[in-house]
């Protein structure tokens, strides 16, 4: 990586921390005010939108969304692949009003961000205490059904930071909730963001995340004994979609992970081969009385 690239990587990393802290503080104020007027359920949406616009302005990032019409009818449980810090930026763009999130309990104690999440109704999960986590999720399900809201879950359970077009194995919590409440699952697939952010390779580029929101999947006829199979099918569908979307388009001013460079080369080769395949083949006729010299000349000219 060049000196300028390394400088940009650290500068943008610092800017993200500042943006998170600033928007977290804003979120604390917004959560208090929204709670006072009986609108606590809007605090996360308001703060998420703020973070989206701040990051877009500061870092030259954006989000392109396909299938947003699939979020029109609540209640539902949204699930998405979990990759990096930029997931918060993506949330800021598509987060529906009245939606809330689940998060690991350790985030609750992060200054500003954790305080905002606690005040705005986030459901914190301690995975080392299974029954407590189940009770918390059931509480979230009750709220979602009663008030026709949405719940956002990252079924991978942690950020993958992967530079491959794949996802970690899914935990089953979101699917148990959906089956129990008979509410649909809405899969959200985000393009691989290692071309935008990757601590492993020192990547922090400007660019655009591509988000595809799939159609809601009914759980009306889903039984408990089929939840594992159902979760695997949903994951397979999401991974297939991820492979279709590929990597996030980036303006490479730091560096790129090798997997993304290889993928770009393969895509280029496919386009070239497709173009060659679709080009009409010139028709060349050679009469019987053409001598060997002229025949060779004709073939050479055709090539």
UniProtKB/Swiss-Prot annotation:
Residues 278-303 are annotated as: Disordered. The gene is SLC1. Belongs to the 1-acyl-sn-glycerol-3-phosphate acyltransferase family. Its main location: other. One of its GO terms (molecular function) is 1-acylglycerophosphocholine O-acyltransferase activity. One of its GO terms (cellular component) is membrane. Residues 284-297 have a biased composition (Polar residues). Its EC number is 2.3.1.23, 2.3.1.51, 2.3.1.n7. It comes from Saccharomyces cerevisiae (strain ATCC 204508 / S288c). Pfam families: Acyltransferase. A motif (HXXXXD motif) lies at residues 82-87. This is 1-acyl-sn-glycerol-3-phosphate acyltransferase. Acyltransferase that catalyzes the sn-2-specific, acyl-CoA-dependent acylation of lysophosphatidic acid (LPA) to phosphatidic acid (PA) in lipid particles. Together with ALE1, plays a central role in PA biosynthesis. PA is the intermediate, from which all glycerophospholipids are synthesized. Can also acylate lysophosphoinositol (LPI) and lysophosphoserine (LPS). The fatty acyl substrates include 18:1-acyl-CoA, 14:0-acyl-CoA, 12:0-acyl-CoA and 10:0-acyl-CoA. Keywords: Acyltransferase, Lipid biosynthesis, Lipid droplet, Lipid metabolism, Phospholipid biosynthesis, Phospholipid metabolism, Transferase. It catalyses: a 1-acyl-sn-glycero-3-phosphate + an acyl-CoA = a 1,2-diacyl-sn-glycero-3-phosphate + CoA; a 1-acyl-sn-glycero-3-phosphocholine + an acyl-CoA = a 1,2-diacyl-sn-glycero-3-phosphocholine + CoA; a 1-acyl-sn-glycero-3-phosphoethanolamine + an acyl-CoA = a 1,2-diacyl-sn-glycero-3-phosphoethanolamine + CoA; 1-hexadecanoyl-sn-glycero-3-phosphate + (9Z)-octadecenoyl-CoA = 1-hexadecanoyl-2-(9Z-octadecenoyl)-sn-glycero-3-phosphate + CoA. It is found in: Lipid droplet. The HXXXXD motif is essential for acyltransferase activity and may constitute the binding site for the phosphate moiety of the glycerol-3-phosphate.
């Amino acid at each position: 990586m060049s000196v300028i690239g390394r400088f940009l990587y650290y500068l943008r990393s610092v800017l993200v921390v500042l943006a998170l802290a600033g928007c977290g503080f804003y979120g604390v104020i917004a959560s208090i005010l929204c709670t006072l007027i009986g609108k606590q359920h809007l605090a996360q949406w308001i703060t998420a939108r703020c973070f989206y616009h701040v990051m877009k302005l500061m870092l030259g990032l954006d989000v392109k969304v396909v299938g947003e019409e699939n979020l029109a009818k609540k209640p539902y449980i949204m699930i998405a692949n979990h990759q990096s810090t930029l997931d918060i930026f993506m949330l800021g763009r598509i987060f529906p009003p009245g939606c809330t999130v689940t998060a690991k309990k350790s985030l609750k104690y992060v200054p500003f961000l954790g305080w905002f999440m606690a005040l705005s109704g986030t459901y914190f999960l301690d995975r080392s205490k299974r029954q407590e986590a189940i009770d918390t999720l059931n509480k979230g399900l009750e709220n979602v059904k009663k008030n026709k809201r949405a719940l956002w879950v990252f079924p991978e359970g942690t950020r993958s930071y992967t530079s491959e077009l794949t996802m970690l194995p899914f935990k089953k919590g979101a699917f148990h909730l959906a089956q129990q409440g008979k509410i649909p699952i809405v899969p959200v697939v985000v393009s691989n963001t290692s071309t935008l952010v990757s601590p492993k390779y020192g990547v922090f580029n400007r660019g655009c995340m591509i988000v595809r929101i799939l159609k809601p999947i009914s759980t009306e006829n889903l039984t408990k004994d089929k939840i594992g199979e159902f979760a695997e099918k949903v994951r397979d569908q999401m991974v297939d979609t991820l492979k279709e979307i590929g990597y996030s388009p980036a303006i490479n001013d730091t560096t790129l992970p090798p997997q993304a460079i290889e993928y770009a080369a393969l895509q280029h080769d496919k386009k070239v081969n497709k173009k060659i395949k679709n080009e009409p083949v010139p028709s060349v006729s050679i009469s019987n009385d053409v001598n060997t010299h002229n025949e060779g000349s004709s073939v050479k000219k055709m090539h």
